[in-house]
């Protein structure tokens, strides 16, 4: 497992070079410059409900239709899932083939079902490094986009072993964004641990309030699991006599 970012963020974003994974980075589509990552090698690297989908993982099914591949902005693709069966006109009008460099050392001719005739449009596919590509186009039309500028290309970051995982990113915003995201994920994980401990002691939310015992007051059955902020003393939905949390026993 190798990290697409600094070593401190390995748990958040990772790519498995052995399975020829791509990491796609998007800094261009959204007005607030959100960064999106996808990695099927570690699909649950962040809980699904974290960060309001700021991080998402995609697994694209095999297809030979470029229009299908273009449907998912920031979609995750592997060489075995990229197959081309296009004529020259389709190649020249294909957004991601001509206008975006999707580079990997593992992309070989064996992955191509029908070799394109305009090889110049896909020459970058055989580059020796993997890269974060700006984005896969949102549109399903075949209207070509402008070639990326030099400044756009300079924002693409290598994602392979060619880059040390301990070296700092060249993009301060990118660093800051991931640091904040990592902190959010860490806080959520801590909260989830707390919830798990409570559920282990008192039962799950579905089971709370279903058992009748000396400490359970039916009038409390609709109270939240955690103390009400303004309650005095704090009221809990259910508590054990030996837990120290109850105000009734």
UniProtKB/Swiss-Prot annotation:
GO cellular component, as recorded: cytosol; nucleus
Keywords tagged on the record: Cytoplasm, Nucleus
Predominant localisation class: cytoplasm
The UniProt record lists the keyword Cytoplasm: yes
Cellular compartments annotated: Cytoplasm; Nucleus
Protein name: Uncharacterized protein C1A4.04
Organism (species): Schizosaccharomyces pombe (strain 972 / ATCC 24843) (Fission yeast)
């Amino acid at each position: 497992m190798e990290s697409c970012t600094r070593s401190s963020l390995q748990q958040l974003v990772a790519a498995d070079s052995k399975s020829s994974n791509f990491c796609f980075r998007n800094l261009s589509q959204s007005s607030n410059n959100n960064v999106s990552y996808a990695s099927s090698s570690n699909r649950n690297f962040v809980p699904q409900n974290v960060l309001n989908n700021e991080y998402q993982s995609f697994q694209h099914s095999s297809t030979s239709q470029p229009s299908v591949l273009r449907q998912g902005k920031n979609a995750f693709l592997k060489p075995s899932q990229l197959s081309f069966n296009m004529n020259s006109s389709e190649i020249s009008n294909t957004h991601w083939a001509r206008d975006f460099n999707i580079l990997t050392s593992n992309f070989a001719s064996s992955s191509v079902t029908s070799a394109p005739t305009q090889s110049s449009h896909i020459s970058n596919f055989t580059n020796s490094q993997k890269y974060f590509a700006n984005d896969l186009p949102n549109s399903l039309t075949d209207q070509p986009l402008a070639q990326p500028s030099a400044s756009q290309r300079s924002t693409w970051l290598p994602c392979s072993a060619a880059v040390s995982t301990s070296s700092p990113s060249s993009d301060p915003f990118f660093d800051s964004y991931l640091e904040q995201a990592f902190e959010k994920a860490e806080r959520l994980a801590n909260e989830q641990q707390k919830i798990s401990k409570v559920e282990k002691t008192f039962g799950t939310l579905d089971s709370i309030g279903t058992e009748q015992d000396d400490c359970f007051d039916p009038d409390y059955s609709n109270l939240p699991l955690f103390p009400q902020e303004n309650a005095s003393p704090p009221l809990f939905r259910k508590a054990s006599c030996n837990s120290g949390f109850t105000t009734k026993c």
